[in-house]
Structures are given as C-alpha cells and as structure tokens.
Amino acid sequence: MDYTKYVLKSQEELEGMLAGKDNLFVVACNKCFKEFETTQEPDCGCFTAIAEAQGKHITGSVKVDFLCNKVQTEKTLAGLVPEGTENVVVVSCGLGVQTVADLAAVPTFTATNSLNYVGHHGMALTKKTCGACAQCYLNATGGICPIVDCSKSLVNGQCGGAKNGKCEIDPKKDCAWEKIYQRLEKQGRTKEFLHQ
C-alpha cells in the first residue's frame, strides 16, 4: 500500500514513546489528499499538547506539504531544526516518517499509526512504501520499516540468511535488518531496541 491515512497513537503508547526523551521538534505532513475528509487526522497540535502535558520541551514545529517528497522536505527542514533538538517526532503516514528519518541527524519517532482506506489515496512521491499495518514499528527500528523493507517482513530481527549485507531472497536488495541495526547503532539506540 503506497498511500495511507493515519491516526494518533494511543495516549499510553505516546507516553511510553516519550519516556526519557525531551527537546522535541515536531514535523507534520500537510497531507496530500485533504479533499478526502472521511477520517479525522491529527496534526502538530494534537501531539504537542500531549507532550507538553508530560513536561516535554518542544523546540519547534513545522507543517510540510508532501512530506514524502525527500527533495522538498530536505529543503524545507534545512536549517529549521533548532540546535539542542534531541529527537524529531513526525505526525504523518509511514512514508513521511521514513523520509524524515532518512534526513534527520537525531532519532526520529512517529506519533501515528498508518491505516489503509481503500479508494482514498494521496500522491506518494517516493519509492518507499507503507504497509498501513495500523501498528507502526518505525519507532523501534529507527525509521526503517521491517514490514515492507524486509523480504520476509520479520519484525523481531534478522533471519540469519543475509550475506555481505544482502538479502537471501533478493540478493540485489540490502538486508533491512542490517540497515536497522546500523542506524540504531549510529544513534546509540541498540540497547533500547534490545529491551523492547
């Protein structure tokens, strides 16, 4: 599924995600299919209110049209994320979250779960895909989706069949779990992943 809608994660999930994190910059997608008003979708303010109620410092926020457009998003975010920002939180479908995670120098988290709504599609401007599984794993995996990027859709780690960083099913494809581990290691988050 390339085009999805999204809902804010439950208050309990958000509180768990925010535990131990502060100095948050919030990025929200302005949505690519606003004419379809069949579901209520969250924006920056929905998440920001929850974070501030937990005493979290918001370093800033921005809404971006077509957040999944990496070139445009990179230009928009350049120089916009304030110094001192420790985490980026994205209010978007999985496509936007993956795009921001690829660009951000700090850990990126999603405040939403993506849902599949048949017939209500936006205009994804990326080769990335979102499974719209309604239980987003991107917070645990550094913004790399194990459902769509792993040929076996494994959610609890590598299968052990990868060779030289390539998938055993599709040798032209990088192993998603090796990429996940490398990103988490770069962000100093491997222990956090192992304790989930």
In which residue ranges do the predicted regions lie?
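Long, charge-rich boundary regions
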Residues: K163-Q196
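Iron-sulfur-associated redox domains of electron-transfer enzymes in respiratory
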Residues: M1-G161, D170-P171, A176
